[in-house]
Each structure stands twice: as structure tokens, then as C-alpha cells.
Amino acid sequence: MKKYIIALLIFSSSIAQAQQTPRQIGEYDDWVVYTYKENNHNVCYMASTPKRDEGKYTKRGDIYIVITHRPGEKSFDVFNVVAGYDYKKDSKVTAKIGKEIFSNFFTDKDKAWTMSETDDRALIKAMMRGERMIIEGQSARGTKTKDTYSLKGFTRAYKTINAKCGKK
């Protein structure tokens, strides 16, 4: 059920026109893969929710990460975190995979993205090698959070979105 909610949340937060409802095309351990049509082009994405979320918060929305391919826009490997709260202005978001730390993110409300395609590719490469990823952030109220994601099934899910959306 939680995975279905992710599909609906991602779909409802998209602002593109002429979309279909996302269709699940695979589930690989802790990762789920979806596709839909947007302006007559395939969009493929994979999503996961944290295995553990930590922080001294009283209320928090849905938390998940997404990797998206939009071949119609020549956009691939877009990494996105949805924190379940609005980020504090100018706060730092970090992703840690093993000993590698990625901190080149920008935020907008409850979402964070890497700063560049190069950062996306480096992060995804590390995710393919890793076992887990820890995302740390700070809410607009100053609450620090730490979310732990499993990377089990990540590589198979990633290969699926690559094949479905024509990324070589």
C-alpha cells in the first residue's frame, strides 16, 4: 500500500499535461519502478521509502526518494528527495553512502535535488555500489532528520528504468 501511495504522490505532484496514471512495472526488493506517458513520451521512475526515519519532530509528511528519466526532454538520472517537511532556508542536505558524502544539493519547499547532472550520475553510481544511503536534512523549524534507505534492489530497478526509457 505504501508503494502505491508513492506512485500517487509523485503523479499528483507533477505539473505536466496529458499524463496517464503511473503503472508499476517492477518491484526489486526495496525499490519500485513505474512508467507513464507524458505528452506522448514515456516517463520512467523508481522510488523507495526509508527503512528508518529519525528526528525529534511532531508531524512529518511522506518521505521518499525518486530517480526519474524523461527521454522526451532528454532528461535522465534526476535524483530527488522528498523530506516530508519544508527544508530550512539555505540548510544543507547530505547523502551518505558508505564513506562517500554528497552535499551538493539545492532545496525547494519539501524537495531536494542535486545541483547538476554530473552530481546525479555520481550519486547513482555510488548507490549502485552501496548497501544503504543516509539522507540528513533540517526542517524550516530547525528539526534535524536522518533517513536511512536500503539500496537492496536499486541496481535492478535502475536497469529496468534504463531499458524502459531507452537510456544506454
Report residues per predicted region:
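...the same signal can extend to comparable exposed beta-sheet modules
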Residues: 1, 16-18
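Sec-dependent N-terminal signal peptides
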Residues: 4-14
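Positively charged n-region of N-terminal signal peptides that target proteins for export
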Residues: 1-4, 31
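A generic "folded-domain core" signal
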Residues: 19-168
